[in-house]
């Protein structure tokens, strides 16, 4: 038996004792986070799949894992040798979890499926319960966390220190943010709200932490009432300075595990709960007169950056651009000298970023995919998969950093030497898609779905496509993936507004061959106002040359060439003052106009 088989056997012994026919393991934590602390990585522990998105479902005789297109290839590799069947989300023929369970449990009498109500959202449990009852009378049990019994040496809850995010970077006081939130609550006829999302809590309080790898958040809950603000957090996270700061801002402190008791005795008439962010367990704990089921107003506020945050982004992008130029100048000669691998170049890039002022951490684990690994959208090199780089072909490097004044996210695909005509063609198609999105002008309030087609059209014309989103929101020294705004094919109703930060990251992936992705972090800014309304534009924030050696110039339109040359001129003008002479010469060559 391998390790995963042993874990499944222990789970099934527990399921048998508890009279459960199946158990569901999500990728989330008690706060519905995308990236979670080690304590909540139960889906990874039970399946061996370490992607940030996915759901494992185990019955007494079978097991399956659902994940999205970013992880199809990685999941195939990681699930190999286990009994898990890979379920590819949004691919025709893939059953839903409820459909699969309905079929797997059709011969089981009075089947009961378990899940932990503390790490599954209220809306998810409600919808799944309805689907299971409709399909075959399957009931849900929500009061069991099997990991507490079967996961030996399970990591404890994180207890890392919390720090104050200075006003010079936050741009708005805690008191001002709370006042805006209360104003929104009054419009929704709510007396208070529970905030579960960790980045929403950090943003509201102008605090940051290190409880989650690469994400400057801290495990906590926040209860905002009409006349009181309560933070539920373990006391040992807070220094005397942070405690005084919270006291000065009239924030009351309670232990993290007291949130349920507080909700049970909540004295206001009603409370707003976001069904996508609030766990099923806490939703059911509320005993007030009325629950206002509505989306939290905080993400929309957080999405529109203020002047200080935008200036922070510009400063962070300068620092990150300097680190990237130093790295790219080093990369090809180092590969030609021999001995460099996907892991070693990742370490080099992180070390160069760490030299920059206000560097705190990377913003996600670097994706450095050489050759066929570049086709694995969210590839992460391990000692088992790491390969030596050769002075030929393409390497895709998706990386980012957390600086105290801003978060960065950038992808560059680099030709390490000679490339094939197919590589040039695919690379140029991706570049065209990237540029077309940066060129677009659009009405204030347009959706990300409308913009998504602009970038993809040149690919669609040739029968190519990619299944991940074209762009996601980016936090301000917060999570690198931030909502509610996105640019993607699926309908996204959130209107795009000036001040929002996003990524522009189209890609194409040829399984077993190579992958190409080009990504800038961008800012939505004002373009013009006419009798037809206000119009917006996309402004690149990322400052880093785009490799021109794999470009088939004949494929580019004049406006695309003009954009690339203007972008490279800006990159050189802004970064060169911070470089030494050799680095300036390298950057000047890397940003030469193409014709």
Each language-model region and where it sits:
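Active-site neighborhoods and metal-handling regions in enzymes and metal-associated proteins
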Residues: 1-595
């Amino acid at each position: 038996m391998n390790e995963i088989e042993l874990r499944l056997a222990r789970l099934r012994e527990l399921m048998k004792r508890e009279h459960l026919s199946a158990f569901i393991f999500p990728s989330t934590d008690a706060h519905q986070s995308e990236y979670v602390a080690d304590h909540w990585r139960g889906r990874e522990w039970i399946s061996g799949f370490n992607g940030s998105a996915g759901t494992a479902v185990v019955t007494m005789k079978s097991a399956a894992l659902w994940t999205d297109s970013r992880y199809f290839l990685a999941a195939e590799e990681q699930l190999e040798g286990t009994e898990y069947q890979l379920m590819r989300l949004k691919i025709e023929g893939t059953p839903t979890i409820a459909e699969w369970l309905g079929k797997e449990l059709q011969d089981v009498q009075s089947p009961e499926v378990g899940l932990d109500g503390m790490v599954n959202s209220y809306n998810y449990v409600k919808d799944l319960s309805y689907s299971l009852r409709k399909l075959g009378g399957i009931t849900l049990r929500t009061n069991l966390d099997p990991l507490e019994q079967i996961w030996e040496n399970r990591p404890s809850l994180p207890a890392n220190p919390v720090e104050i995010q200075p006003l010079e970077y936050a741009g708005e006081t805690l008191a001002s943010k709370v006042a805006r939130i209360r104003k929104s609550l009054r419009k929704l006829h709510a007396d208070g709200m529970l905030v579960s999302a960790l980045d929403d809590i950090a943003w509201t309080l102008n605090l940051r932490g290190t409880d989650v790898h690469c994400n400057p958040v801290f495990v906590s809950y926040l209860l905002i009432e009409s006349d009181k603000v309560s933070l539920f957090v373990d006391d040992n996270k807070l220094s005397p300075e942070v405690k005084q700061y919270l006291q000065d801002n009239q924030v009351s402190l309670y232990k993290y595990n007291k949130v349920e008791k507080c909700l049970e005795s909540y004295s206001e008439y009603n409370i707003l709960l976001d069904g996508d962010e609030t766990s099923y367990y806490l939703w059911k704990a509320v005993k007030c007169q009325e629950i206002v089921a509505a989306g939290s107003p905080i993400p929309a506020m957080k999405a529109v950056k203020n002047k200080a945050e935008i200036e922070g982004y510009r400063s962070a992008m300068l620092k990150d651009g300097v680190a990237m130029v130093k790295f790219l100048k080093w990369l090809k000669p180092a590969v030609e000298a021999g001995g460099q691998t996907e892991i070693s170049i990742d370490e080099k890039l992180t070390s160069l970023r760490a030299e920059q002022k206000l560097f705190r951490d990377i913003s996600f684990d670097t994706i450095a995919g050489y050759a066929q690994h570049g086709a694995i959208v969210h590839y992460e090199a391990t000692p088992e998969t790491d390969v030596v780089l050769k002075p030929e072909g393409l390497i895709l490097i998706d990386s980012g950093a957390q600086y105290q004044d801003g978060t960065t996210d950038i992808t560059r695909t680099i030709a390490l030497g000679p490339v094939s005509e197919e590589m040039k063609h695919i690379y140029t198609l991706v570049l065209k898609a990237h540029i077309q999105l940066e060129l677009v002008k659009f009405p204030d309030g347009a959706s990300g779905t409308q913009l998504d087609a602009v970038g993809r059209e040149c690919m669609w014309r040739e029968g190519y496509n990619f299944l991940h989103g074209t762009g996601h929101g980016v936090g301000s020294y917060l999570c690198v993936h931030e909502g509610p705004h996105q640019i993607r094919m699926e309908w996204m109703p959130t209107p795009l507004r000036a001040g929002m930060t996003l990524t522009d990251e189209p890609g194409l992936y040829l399984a077993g061959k190579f992958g190409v992705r080009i990504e800038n972090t961008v800012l939505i800014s004002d373009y013009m106002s006419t009798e037809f309304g206000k119009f917006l534009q996309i402004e690149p924030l990322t400052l880093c040359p785009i490799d021109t050696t794999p470009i088939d110039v004949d494929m580019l339109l004049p406006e695309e060439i003009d954009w690339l040359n203007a972008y490279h001129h800006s990159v050189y003008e802004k970064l060169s003052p911070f470089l030494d002479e050799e680095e300036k010469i390298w950057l000047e060559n890397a940003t030469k106009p193409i014709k």
